[in-house]
Curated annotation (Swiss-Prot):
The keyword Repressor applies. This is Protein HIR1. Keywords: Chromatin regulator, Nucleus, Repeat, Repressor, Transcription, Transcription regulation, WD repeat. Coiled coil: none annotated. The lineage of its organism: Eukaryota, Fungi, Dikarya, Ascomycota, Saccharomycotina. Residues 661-678, 687-696 have a biased composition (Polar residues).
Length: 1058
């Protein structure tokens, strides 16, 4: 072993040396790249450095050849000064094509050698001319502070960068697009290393933790990440004075060497075990904090014979061998046990080299540099080591054969990585012909779907251009509004009047920008009130919830005279106040800490005062009813207004149940068979509420009066449409229902208390009284969908307590009914509810927990234009997002970080993935309950894909079994359809979606055969395979087919037994 410091191997300018922060060696061992304080990336000839060590280096100006090898005799091959700050990290990609460099200018540059470009000497430099040309292929700018370290995946598929902004950013290794930012650390991130098995990567931070991230790739651009573990124990007392915390993963994948750890007061290198992620071994050999630890990329053997001997042991026997020797054990290791070597260095200016065959360091080089050693890089053959220092020096360490051991072949590395799913044998091979056929079907379907989406996009663009060019008239479908003449003390906002799913409107009409409220303080300063982003979005039916953040564009169908989308959700009967309708509940508990001991030892309740501003001013019950004073729930009700108006545009063709009720206009024309749209106005003018001045109720169609009625009481709520019925609500809670032509269909419905909500959709009429009772009727069938239900369970009245017995509950922010008769209510707590008739219970559709714990909360779903009328689940989640943002105020990001910190605590590993899967399962159940078939189909496909990615074969089997059904033994409880979707067709889509995940292919093939998805293709492929194979391969295929037949027979028998 010898150490060489060539005088020319440094970052210098005009006799001044600059600090050097990083070094890396190319995979072919021909180039060494360094980065320093001078802002330059320098590439050196590795051969020239080795020749300098031997003393026979000769200078040469011969340019680099085109084969990729540096010019013989050249020292500095290239100098690049593109960065605007000090270069803190340089790393070659494992395939040798790219060089990634990071700097304190917050930018990562990806370089590639250009053999066609003539190298030129840098202007103003006094050194030798470049012999190679490297150009910037990509500039990656996403960090907010200095970049400290970066690393490539073993297959160069992804690039991960870390920096002082506490961020971990993942980039594509092919397109260099940003894939994801992981905010798992709470302080500077100063080191990163990849698992050679290509399953994990680890990051080290000044928050005294090492985070282990698992990543799964379904394709080159489809990568999912989750936190596998958080290691804290070895770093609890680690100092924060180091420049870096560069860690390294062992070549066999068993261990991580983490720098800047402590064992009591002593600075050590912690060895972290894979799988358990604990640290029971510490390398003690430094007197000051360690900056960098680096495993040699090769595995060694103790003797030359052991290195040359071919390993014939089974993988199970290899697993039993231990790679790390206990410190207290004898330094005698069997020759068959492979050895790994690790180098470490830091602020004590000492280089220490260890191997797993000896409990003590193999080499300790004191005062190797004058200042801190910042980086270490091994050559790919494992026989040399490079070190950089803040004194400007770059050291080269050359080992002789046998000093560290004897290098074994790379097959040994790959064989040991196989147990973790790495190496050449990591790819799971298909087990049968059926799996190959399934993969072909999946690929063909993906290509077909891609072409179909492209055709739809091109077709939509063409149709839009044609419509504009021809000057076609676009007829909007206006949402229900309250006339400006109906002056009332109710303050309306854009958010409050937005329906649960946005109303269909003309997409060509630009949305007006929301005006921000500007106030001037006493000192003359202007203050602009923050505007909630979701309130500025256009309320166009068919757009996805504003809570989504994906950049994917969602096509919106234009509402022309030929096709007018119909809103399938009840429009609000009146403009809700800001924050929703207030509620008061009577609690059933008393707070224990509100009791104090009296003089006689008896506990008495503390009296509390209620501020006057807690009582809502804009909404109050219109009458005092005995039911209200004794009810457990009290809701605010709208005040009586002079004018109520409801406008809408419908067509007669949209009357599936009432088409026979034609409307005759004044000229005698019958319009029942017309398909043209008609404009309806439902108007109520309140009188004095007595017989002398009654209230006038009227409906007009295309400005022609349909009917007029008079009632001797105040009307404060209206609902209905021109297809099924009209409805009015009196101040005493009675409801009068009219047919589209004005006939009283029912006697007045008496609820016993004033109404707070009156909504309608299709044939359904929804009413909620001020005492919290919910009613739902099918007006056409003249039946109640279910008995009256109280809102008390969802207002959480049972867990509330107050001395006075009455306290403020959550506000009702939205209430409505779908076209299929499903009630949806959202509260100011962010939760959305529906009442299920079969379960006789309220069910929670959405809650703020999913927003903080699920990876799918902000995922945009392209459900297609045909589903614009039934995006109930996503619409409820939009309400949840709005309420969560409103309640968090400006602390949303802070609360998110707190949640992330919780997910990273010990015992909560993998929690985010579990919550994400649970969120998808909740979405599926909610979509099925709301009969939203388009959402149900999308969520099932998403769920199948996720559980297949996670390798949850039991859940994949459970999902497929439910869609397949009981087989021959017909089960009366099983239905072949769900929400109008054929379960077997859904199963085909699920099988094709999970078919590319080989961990789940065995399950997918069985169910694909059960529904006849693979029968014809399997016969064709099997016969062609038999004719082309040899006799031995034929016997093997016959055995595989026989086993497959037995599996299919067993599967069918199991189905018939059930």
């Amino acid at each position: 072993m010898y150490i060489v410091k060539p005088s020319w191997l440094c970052h210098s300018d005009d006799q001044k040396k600059f600090e050097v922060y990083s070094v890396t060696v190319s995979p072919d061992n021909q180039r060494v790249a360094t980065g320093g304080q001078d802002g330059k990336v320098r590439i050196w000839s590795a051969q020239s450095i080795r020749d300098s060590a031997k003393g026979d280096n000769e200078s040469s100006d011969t340019p680099s050849n085109l084969s990729g090898a540096p010019a013989p005799g050249a020292k500095q091959l290239c100098s690049m000064a593109t960065h605007n700050g000090a270069v803190t990290v340089v790393r070659f990609s494992p395939d040798g094509r790219y060089l990634a460099t990071g700097s304190d200018d917050r930018v990562v540059l990806v370089w590639e050698r250009d053999s066609t470009k003539v190298p030129r000497k840098e202007f103003g430099s006094s050194g030798e001319a470049d012999t190679e040309s490297w150009i910037v292929r990509k500039r990656l700018a996403a960090h907010d502070n200095d970049i400290q370290d970066l690393a490539w995946a073993p297959d160069s598929s992804i690039l991960v960068t870390v920096g002082l902004d506490s961020g971990v950013i993942v980039w594509s290794g092919t397109t260099f697009e940003k894939i994801q930012r992981l905010d798992a650390h709470n302080s500077h991130v100063k080191g990163i290393t990849f698992d050679p098995a290509n399953k994990f990567f680890a990051t080290a931070s000044d928050d005294r933790t090492v985070q282990i991230f698992r990543y799964n790739r379904a394709s080159a651009t489809d990568v999912t990440f989750s936190t596998e573990a958080t290691i804290t124990s070895p770093f609890k007392q680690s100092p924060l004075s180091t420049y870096f915390r560069r860690c390294s993963w062992s070549p066999d994948g068993n261990h991580i060497a983490a720098a800047n750890a402590t064992n009591g007061p002593v600075s050590v290198v912690a060895i972290i075990n894979r799988g358990t992620w604990d640290s029971d071994i510490s390398l003690i050999g430094h007197e000051a904090p360690c900056e960098v630890a680096a495993f040699c990329p090769r595995i060694f053997a103790r003797t030359k014979e052991a290195a040359e001997k071919k390993d014939k042991k089974s993988s199970s026997e290899k697993d039993k061998e231990s790679d790390v020797i206990d410190v207290d054990a004898e330094p005698k290791v069997p020759e068959s046990v492979p050895i790994t070597v690790i180098a470490s260095a830091g602020q004590d200016k000492t280089l220490t080299i260890w191997n797993t065959s000896n409990p003590r360091p193999v080499v300790v080089c004191h005062d190797m540099a004058l200042k801190t050693i910042t980086d270490l890089a091994w050559s790919q053959d494992g026989m040399s080591l490079f070190a950089t220092s803040l004194d400007g020096s770059i050291s080269y360490v050359q080992f002789e054969e046998g000093e560290l051991g004897y290098v074994v072949s790379m097959e040994e590395n790959e064989s040991r990585l196989t147990r973790y799913g790495g190496g050449k044998e990591a790819a799971q091979i298909p087990e049968s012909v059926e799996q190959l056929v399934l993969e072909e079907k999946v690929e063909a379907k993906e290509v077909k779907d891609s072409e179909k989406r492209m055709e739809e996009l091109m077709g939509a663009a063409g149709a839009g251009s044609k419509a504009i060019a021809s000057g076609a008239t676009v007829i909007p479908s206006p949402a229900s509004t309250v006339a400006a003449a109906a002056a009332a003390p109710v303050t309306t906002t854009a958010r409050a009047t937005t329906p649960l799913t946005a109303a269909t409107s003309n997409p060509s009409t630009p949305a007006k920008p929301a005006k921000q409220k500007v106030t001037i303080t006493k000192d003359g300063r202007k203050r602009v009130a923050p505007q909630l982003l979701t309130t500025t979005s256009s309320s166009v039916q068919g757009t996805l919830p504003a809570a989504t953040t994906s950049s994917a564009a969602v096509p919106v169908a234009s509402a022309t005279a030929e096709t007018i989308p119909v809103n399938d959700f009840s429009k609000p009967s009146y403009a809700l106040p800001k924050g929703g309708v207030s509620t008061l509940v009577i609690g059933s508990k008393r707070r224990s800490d509100d009791l104090e001991d009296g003089s006689n030892g008896i506990q008495t309740a503390l009296k509390k005062t209620r501020p006057d501003d807690d009582v809502p001013e804009y909404i109050a019950p219109v009458v005092v009813s005995p039911a209200t004073t004794t009810s457990q729930v009290r809701l605010g009700a709208p005040k009586v207004r002079n004018l109520l108006m409801r406008s809408m545009t419908v067509r007669d063709a949209e009357k599936p149940r009432m088409a026979n009720e034609s409307v005759s206009l004044a000229n005698g024309e019958n319009t029942s068979s017309s398909s043209a749209p008609h404009s309806f106005n439902f108007e109520v003018r309140n009188g004095s509420g007595n017989d002398q001045t009654p209230t006038k109720v009227s409906v007009t169609r295309n400005s022609q009066v349909v009917f007029v009625d008079f009632v001797p009481y105040y009307v404060h709520l209206i609902a209905g449409n021109g297809c099924y019925f009209w409805a009015t609500s009196a101040e005493d809670g009675s409801i009068v229902v009219y047919s589209p032509n004005g006939r009283r269909m029912l006697p007045p419905l008496v609820t016993g208390a004033p109404l707070s909500f009156l909504e309608s959709q299709n044939e359904y009429l929804l009413a909620i009284s001020s005492v919290g009772m919910l009613y739902l009727w099918n007006v056409v069938d003249k039946k109640a969908v279910f008995p009256p239900v109280s809102l008390a369970p969802i207002l959480d009245s049972g867990s509330r307590y107050e001395d006075g017995g009455v306290l403020r509950g959550p506000h009702v922010t939205q209430c409505g009914v779908t076209g299929s008769g499903r009630v949806i209510i959202t509260l100011s707590t962010g939760c959305g509810y529906t009442y299920d008739e079969g379960l006789r219970s309220w069910c929670r559709l959405s809650e703020p927990w999913w927003a903080t714990g699920s990876q799918y909360w902000s995922a945009t779903q392209l459900l297609g234009d045909e589903s614009a009328k039934s995006r109930w689940v996503l619409a409820v989640e939009e309400r949840t997002a709005e309420e969560a943002q409103r309640r968090a105020g400006g602390r949303g990001r802070y609360l998110k970080q707190l949640t992330r910190a919780t997910l990273n605590r010990e015992g909560y590993e993998g929690m985010e993935g579990v919550v994400s899967i649970a969120h998808l399962e909740n979405r599926i159940a909610a979509a099925e309950m709301l009969e939203s078939k388009h959402e149900l189909r999308t969520f099932i496909i998403m769920y199948a894909r996720r559980i297949a990615e996670e390798g949850l074969r039991s859940r994949v089997d459970e999902l497929c079994r439910e869609l397949l059904g009981p087989g021959k033994s017909q089960d009366s409880t099983w239905s072949p359809t769900v929400c109008g979707l054929d379960k077997h067709e859904l199963l085909k889509e699920v099988v094709l979606k999970i078919g590319k995940y080989r961990e789940s292919q065995r399950v997918a093939v069985v169910y694909g055969q059960a529904i006849g998805l693979l029968e014809d293709e399997v016969l064709g492929v099997a016969s062609s395979s038999k004719s082309a194979a040899s006799k031995g391969s034929k016997d093997k295929e016959d055995n595989e087919e026989e086993d497959g037949d037995h599996d299919m027979t067993d599967f069918k028998d199991a189905m018939s037994e059930q």
